[in-house]
């Protein structure tokens, strides 16, 4: 991988330097690219860039990256990436595994981390693929994940959370877990998945329900617990 990170942040309510950690990559021989600020390298100064250059020859599966400078990733500097295995032992279980089969869960705060209450009150919103509602505003956009009846999907579930864990489920659907934290997993069929900050799962989903809309739910461990008006929710659309 060659990933050039450019620090162009200029919001004075947030940290303007940065350092990116590629979560759970072993970094054998490239510890300088691991991204722990002030441990492996200095942060990238505003207006400058840094090229992270590393390999992952024996690792496949679901990963994520995030700022490793103080609380910066809680303000949104985080994301997912998938390393595909050309010899995936689960390939016969699914028909679709692409950029549309990623599901990210994150907590979102209306106040920048360094100005807030250190998360003691819980997040204002749970974001599913970057969108979510907060109490008192039922108009905010919800993520819609489109699937086709009769197809089999491999979904990559990633917790980008800064603090809470979530219980993830899809109404009227079962999920079969096949990967945990980039390690192939014995098949385990469940109704829900409890996922903590930094964890990743892959699950196989067969779309065998009636054509309809189904709630995707991510119940946080603290904060706003309700699903009222679409809080902590997204939509699976058959």
Curated annotation (Swiss-Prot):
Residues 4-87, 100-238 form the Plastocyanin-like domain. Activity is strongly promoted by toluene. Activity is promoted by magnesium, potassium, cadmium, zinc, nickel, sodium, lead and manganese ions. Completely inhibited by IAA (cysteine protease inhibitor), PMSF (serine protease inhibitor), DEP (histidine protease inhibitor) and NAI (tyrosine protease inhibitor). Inhibited by ethanol, acetone, SDS, and EDTA. Activity is strongly inhibited by mercury ions. Also inhibited by lithium, aluminum, calcium, barium and iron ions. Gene3D superfamilies: Cupredoxins - blue copper proteins (2.60.40.420). Binds 4 Cu cations per monomer. It catalyses: 4 hydroquinone + O2 = 4 benzosemiquinone + 2 H2O. Its cofactor is Cu cation. This is Laccase-S.
């Amino acid at each position: 991988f060659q990933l050039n990170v450019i620090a162009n942040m200029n919001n004075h309510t947030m940290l303007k330097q940065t350092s990116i950690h590629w979560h759970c990559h072993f970094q054998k021989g490239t510890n300088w690219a691991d991204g722990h600020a002030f441990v492996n390298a200095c942060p990238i100064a505003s207006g400058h860039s840094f090229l992270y250059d590393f390999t992952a020859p024996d690792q496949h599966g679901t990963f994520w990256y995030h700022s490793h400078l103080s609380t910066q990733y809680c303000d949104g500097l985080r994301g997912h990436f998938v390393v595909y295995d050309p010899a995936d032992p689960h390939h016969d279980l699914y028909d679709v595994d692409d950029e549309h089969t990623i599901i990210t869960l994150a907590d979102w705060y209306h106040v920048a981390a360094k100005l807030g209450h250190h998360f003691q009150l819980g997040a204002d919103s749970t974001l599913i693929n970057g969108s979510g509602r907060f109490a008192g505003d039922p108009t905010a956009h919800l993520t819609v994940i489109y699937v086709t009846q009769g197809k089999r999907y491999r979904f990559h579930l990633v917790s980008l959370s800064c603090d809470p864990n979530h219980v993830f489920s899809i109404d009227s659907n079962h999920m079969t877990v096949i990967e945990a934290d980039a390690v192939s997993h014995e098949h385990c069929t469940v109704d829900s998945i409890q996922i903590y900050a930094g964890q990743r799962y892959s699950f196989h989903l067969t779309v065998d329900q009636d054509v309809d809309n189904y709630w995707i739910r991510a119940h946080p461990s603290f904060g706003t617990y309700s699903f009222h008006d679409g809080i902590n929710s997204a939509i699976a659309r058959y």
